[in-house]
């Protein structure tokens, strides 16, 4: 071709490069000489040239070589082009008898022996391509001659001929609470579709019958197999499209041909692609999978093999070469005795020995491992190596010098054969399909097409097209690039060296960092990974069923002691532990926490004590330590010193450090262990993980107390003790063997009282445990067969009866009954010293008894008592489960001590019982008493302010001379005013005096003196010396009182106003706040009663404390200078992130609280405040004058007015609809709070509609009223009464109702569009009448449109308009007319407005014009007119409103912009504004008009009401809920009730708030009364009344209250109670008592009268005022509900009545009976006056006045009773009353000292008089 003229025919002439023909022979088509590619045509033995002219040393070619070892007797063409004589070998070696494609005796479609690719080498008897009858097998196994040669589709599969392929599916699996989708495989062969009709036994029987009892090779060649497994069958006239054959190559489909006839080329019966289950069918390689072969075959089976590796005989290669060895099938295993798989190789497709198709341990291409380039492993599929795969090689892909050489030019092996059967010599670069396509660089080897190849060390070769190249080979088809010599020597010589090198590279690949466990396995073994991924892998199954190592709250296993998982001698670091753990397991360490490599653990190795040692009480009852003792979390788990050297890997110490049993009893410490305590406790866990674990344990994260309390080791210890003790069977079956437990009666006594039936019934049974507590069961208890060991568990601070609830009997049976439980040793633990608090005073201070009572109440028990001496907690239970005190209960309620924990130095404690004396200094000033000491001395909270931003002055050295007096524990905490004074630098004592002088409302001077002590004079230096920071004890005032003794002691002075005596206070163990003990400088001592008011230290060594104020920032730092400037992006610090922003607080009635600038108002006073003097004349020392400036940290309270004040007309818009609503509502008073419900029906709709229709014109001009009018008239049209329907006698049909509603809705549409239409017509009537006509049409005003068209001369248009209401045919004719205009392009000459009318008349909303324009009928129309067009013109006249609405929705909701032709239903305030509404985030709630929502609700009864009632669908004001609320009530009347409770609440609360802001709070109550929930309704109404009820009586307030009580039926008591709250706020006690009485709160009214009003009335003798209150409270039905009525109110009332009775007696003569009755009343008062409670000095004054007055009354009454003669003129003399009748009553009266002295004087005189009279 390349060295000859181009005139040579396709097959003739001498070829290039010295050959005789271009492609082999000098022949044309049909001659008997050379083939297409240099050979004879399918088997001739001509010595012809190659493709490019190379001469061949051996005959052979692509399709016709003699490689099949058959003699060639004639020549033929390559593809059968031309004649052929004699016999020749075809592609696959069968004998042909002279065939030709075009000119032989057998034509192409009826030949006997076809050639080519139809039937390669088959011998047939007759038949053509489409209808031949074949009797012998072709290389594809067909008996008939189509391309793929299927034979039969009728044979059913017998046995397991099809490889098992598990069907896959999907399923869901829940893991860790998360549901995930997983893939499943059904591992059963009967689950396959092919075998679903058979059982396992049937399949096994068929396999036995077919002699399939072992592994079957699925690929080996057999006799007469098809291309893809079809077996041959004898049939006649087989054709590609119409044959009668029954076999198909691919086994697809059914037994039909491709064009509907009986069979097809793809329609065999047995299913799979690569080998079917038919015994008769054959696969690609001449045998089905799993069948043994008995005869050799040619063709694509390339040298027969047995099934999947079984031996076969007489195998050949692709072109007939006998193979050197006989390894496995296509994908099968390699054997030692068989070859002939896919392409003449001995193993899998790519050469790997396999056990079967896809078996475990192999891949598709036969690889064992996937290695990198350049490595050599046990197997690697190079191309063309030892008895190879697809291209003759066995090992995996290695692109380098190898012991196995490749057919791709990478070295071949001696025994391997190439794809086309050539047998390369030793040490050659063999042939193959690779880069050296067809070349063989080796010892005399022929190429693919017969070319001579140079040896590896030979002369220069030729290139692809004759180009010379160094040591290169000649290639075909351009693949002949020069190949470098890879192995210049024999590759086998370097095999050992390569193996060693590959081993090193492999080890470096898999372990690049050596044996370090940290970097182990960076690259996982693919084979191992594939094995792990298989579900049948045991490791995978174990990992699936094994729980994870760590859980959030792992529950400790029952009685499982942690074991050491490692030996103690190992010095291995824990840093890399756990990195190489492949799979989890359920070993003992599964639940043990492992050290985290992310935590830095610093061990303290110096064993030094961080804190001073604290003495502990070693008690058996001590509870486990909960806080660290000298750094250790649990003292009883502390390690000894020698354990510090223990290996850290010991899990015992590791687990015990992080987990402990919270119920476990502490280990008693021996003296030896106590001696090591300091050393063991020094091992401080100074890590975060330890702190976290401690916090977790402290918070109870190790498990609930109920769980851990049962499953601890104390129960096991008890059981062990039971087993070791001697066990004797009790006669009644009672079991109690636990050590320490006892019963009352004892077990022996119980045995004695057991009856003959073996029953033991005992009364008042008690079971207890020594030192822990007992349980007392009252009544008869049946103890028969009770195992008390398992039932009763009494432990420290808890008791459990019936651990297992399943075994618990019903309440009242067994021990599950009422009982009294006593738990001993229940004391709290001091969190500082870890000692038990046993002091009764300490227990009382922390209110431990109250805490136990609260715990008892929480557990359902009844608290009885607590005995601090023994720590006994007694409570009663009604039934049993578990009761006790947990650690969380002890920490639940923290009672801070009355003093702060600022610890100071202490002085020695004086001996008990020593009299405390005050020492006097030389200048007469008293010295402080000796100071005492307690284990922990704390400074008083009154002295030290604990403000967060105050400088801690307690850390500074305290002067030694500063002293402080002894203060009892119950000292009151520091007051807020004291802190404020200290922060401002003011003397706190001075501030208290100033506050007391200004607020002298209830406390007199005595009370202030009692609280603050003596008022020092200006000249008194004691006040100057004494620091204002030091507290002045309340006890000093009591100590300084002069106690009046003897007969003249005043009961008034000795009442409840005295502080406890000094002796009582000395008995306490005081917590002192003193600093040091100052030595006395005075030799004199003064007794306690003569002490001064308060003590001060000596002035000589005194160094007074300075009043240190809180160092606050005086002003606001500018933002630029602040440390927070520019740090607003620090999201993790909320303070920096928020910066100086503040929260805006909204109050009631539009009140706004903010800390920024004022929104309005003047700032005139800013920075202009004049400093004022703060001198006060009564203060001992004036405070320095300070200027007051406005604080930068202030809060502004402003009332915002969103709008101007409403006019009366505006208020009518609020009131009128509400009045209409009230008119059509019903008030239910079934409950205390009335409920208002709407009347069902549509009457309220007509009421609203009539109101808006009759409103004044100026009111209707308001936009909001316009919209209200549209809404109510639409409701009337949709749901209201229609005259047409009401006039009918019978019930109208549904069709008539729908039609009438349509007409009413049409009228509404016309009415709403009328104003806009009139405006448009007035503008376009003259200039553009067509537009005016269209405007009339949008309002359904057809007659006016016709008239206008006639007036403008457009008569034809008028004629068309008159037919709008006609039939559908008019619209169809107009549509045809528009189509004709469009076709003729005449519409371009018609005005757009006229076309718009025509489109409207034709019922086309959008019409496409010929000029690529559109006519949109709905353009520039609002949504209501657009909807009207759809209803009137685009739909039939009978269409309903719902259908028109649906069509309109499609017009504006279409997803495609081009399909949208109508505007959305925007609210009226947005229509025409030009605003473009953006897409809402929530597509379910678009912004649409309320009328549209009403139409949707009419169409769909279940339409959502939330968006309908949205204020934005009505008005631009989002807070205007007027129409929304009224609409909701109307819909409720129509039985639309599917609004959520939350939305309903928001609606009602918002509208009520709106009314409240307008001043219509009484109507807001009306709105609240519609709430269905009675509790919420009452609360809302009461809160509203409290905010707005006024004390002043005005006509307006009276009218509102009348409206509430009469029309809304609100209880009047609620209004009075609200007024009482208002009076309390204004401190008007009189009105507060009055309204409390009216509200029915008798007890509160009585308390207020007695405490604040009675004293003033008694002192001022305003008896009628006080009597008015008390007599109203006196009736029994009221007084019985009043607390302390007998000792308070009734005493005052009786006193007033006695005075009135005395006045009446003095004015009118009275009988002796009245005097006797009066005497009884007076004597009763004498006994009860002292019972009146006194709260201040005014109460005591009133009490004393009453006492003196009653004493005089008693004298008068007695004198009247003892007058000698009633008729005499002598006046009664009170001084002559007998002493025996007067003295007992006078002595009971609580009179002050002066009154008492006066009475004593009188009684003395009477006594002396009686003595004198008696002596005479």
From Swiss-Prot:
Its main location: nucleus. The modification Phosphothreonine is found at residues 670, 1069, 1771. Residues 525-534 have a biased composition (Basic and acidic residues). It comes from the Eukaryota. The active site is at residue 881. Pfam families: Nucleoporin2 (PF04096), Nup96 (PF12110), Nup98_GLEBS (PF21240). The record marks 880-881 as: Cleavage. Residues 1-156 are annotated as: FG repeats 1. The modification Phosphoserine is found at residues 524, 608, 612, 618, 623, 625, 653, 673, 680-681, 839, 888, 934, 1027, 1042, 1059, 1063, 1328. Residues 157-213 are annotated as: GLEBS. The N-terminus is blocked. The modification N6-acetyllysine is found at residue 603. There is a cross-link at residues 563, 603, 665 (Glycyl lysine isopeptide (Lys-Gly) (interchain with G-Cter in SUMO2)). Residues 670-682 have a biased composition (Polar residues). One of its GO terms (biological process) is nuclear pore complex assembly. Keywords: Acetylation, Autocatalytic cleavage, Hydrolase, Isopeptide bond, Membrane, mRNA transport, Nuclear pore complex, Nucleus, Phosphoprotein, Protease, Protein transport, Repeat, Serine protease, Translocation, Transport, Ubl conjugation. Its EC number is 3.4.21.-. GO terms for cellular component: kinetochore; nuclear body; nuclear envelope; nuclear inclusion body; nuclear membrane; nuclear periphery; nuclear pore; nuclear pore cytoplasmic filaments. It is a peripheral membrane protein. Belongs to the nucleoporin GLFG family. Plays a role in the nuclear pore complex (NPC) assembly and/or maintenance. Involved in the bidirectional transport across the NPC. May anchor NUP153 and TPR to the NPC. Plays a role in the nuclear pore complex (NPC) assembly and/or maintenance. NUP98 and NUP96 are involved in the bidirectional transport across the NPC. May anchor NUP153 and TPR to the NPC. In cooperation with DHX9, plays a role in transcription and alternative splicing activation of a subset of genes. Involved in the localization of DHX9 in discrete intranuclear foci (GLFG-body). This is Nuclear pore complex protein Nup98-Nup96. It comes from Rattus norvegicus (Rat). The gene is Nup98.
